[in-house]
């Protein structure tokens, strides 16, 4: 199991250390993944500290149950198999109404990318799937083969920011009229054929942005992150902290917006006095995002686009 779920944790110390861990605190790893952040965070907790780990991928939880066994044996870890958009209600089931810190490592994990049959990668031939939760109903196959032209253009442009969204959607529409598009390599080839030759000379795979867009749509990644981060801000105790690692501009813009909204007074400008209930709930720990070190970038190519934003709760 361990070898099957190899994952190099990004911004490990930065994301956890910035939570300013209290040994007896209650913490949440909203994106368990390869359990690297969880393992480090647990090493900083005392016997009374507790960590709640969310993941919708059963394989991630199975792997973590091996990796974190010493802490499980001490009763310091609780696994919750669910989408983190249900953060508040699932924690409430465990009697938790307030937390000292929470960490998000957004996006798809390395094992999910590397596992061919999950259909996340444009580099390997596999059925079109892209579900983070293998029990979920919507797959990439449904998106590609049943969404109408306008819906395809919308998600390609909104979530992939690809300027050739219309041309790609048209190619897909033409191809699926003959037979369903069923594999990742079929889709990648169609995307490539829709782009002009000069575009194909640019760095990066021509299908990258469209695969990202479909993955975000299948898993409602931005909707889930938006809902979950807002719940997390409410759940934080005074002086509690939230760390969010993002890997593309859409996630980062969302996080930046939510943090800015919560760190701005909800009162008209020019008021001589701001009532406590209108004061900001958050304070930014770092104005600019924290980036991986040069050493980390050399060791892990997937860290290149990572950004970390951290905020602290200053008002309940």
Curated annotation (Swiss-Prot):
It holds the Pfam family Methyltransf_5. GO terms for biological process: rRNA base methylation. It is found in: Cytoplasm. InterPro entries: RsmH, SAM-dep_MeTrfase_MraW_recog, SAM-dependent_MTases_sf. The keyword S-adenosyl-L-methionine applies. Its EC number is 2.1.1.199. It is an enzyme of class 2 (transferase). The keyword Methyltransferase applies. This is Ribosomal RNA small subunit methyltransferase H.
């Amino acid at each position: 199991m361990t070898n099957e779920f190899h994952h190099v944790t990004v911004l490990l110390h930065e994301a956890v250390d910035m939570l300013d861990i209290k040994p007896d605190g209650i913490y949440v790893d909203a994106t368990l993944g390869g359990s690297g952040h969880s393992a480090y965070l647990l090493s900083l907790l005392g016997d009374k500290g507790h960590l709640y780990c969310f993941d919708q991928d059963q394989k991630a939880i199975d792997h973590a149950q091996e990796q974190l066994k010493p802490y499980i044996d001490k009763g310091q870890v609780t696994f919750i198999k669910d989408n983190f958009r249900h953060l508040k209600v699932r924690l409430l089931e465990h009697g938790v109404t307030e937390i000292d810190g929470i960490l998000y490592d957004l996006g798809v994990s390395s094992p999910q990318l590397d596992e061919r049959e999950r259909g996340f990668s444009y580099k390997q031939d596999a059925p079109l799937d892209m579900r983070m939760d293998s029990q979920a109903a919507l797959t990439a196959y449904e998106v590609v083969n049943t969404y109408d032209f306008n819906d395809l253009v919308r998600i390609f442009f909104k979530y992939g920011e690809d300027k050739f969204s219309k041309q790609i959607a048209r190619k897909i529409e033409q191809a699926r009229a003959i037979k369903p598009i069923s594999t990742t390599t079929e889709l990648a080839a169609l995307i490539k054929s829709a782009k002009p030759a000069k575009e194909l000379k640019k760095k990066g795979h021509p299908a990258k942005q469209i695969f990202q867009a479909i993955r975000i749509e299948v898993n409602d990644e931005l909707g889930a992150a938006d809902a979950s981060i807002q719940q997390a801000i409410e759940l934080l105790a005074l002086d509690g902290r939230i760390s969010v690692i993002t890997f593309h501009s859409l996630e980062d813009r969302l996080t930046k917006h939510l943090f800015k909204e919560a760190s701005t007074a909800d009162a008209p400008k020019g008021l001589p006095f701001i009532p406590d209930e209108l004061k900001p709930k958050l304070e930014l720990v770092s104005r600019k995002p924290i980036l991986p070190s040069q050493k980390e970038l050399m060791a892990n190519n997937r860290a290149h686009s990572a950004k970390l934003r951290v905020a602290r709760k200053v008002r309940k």
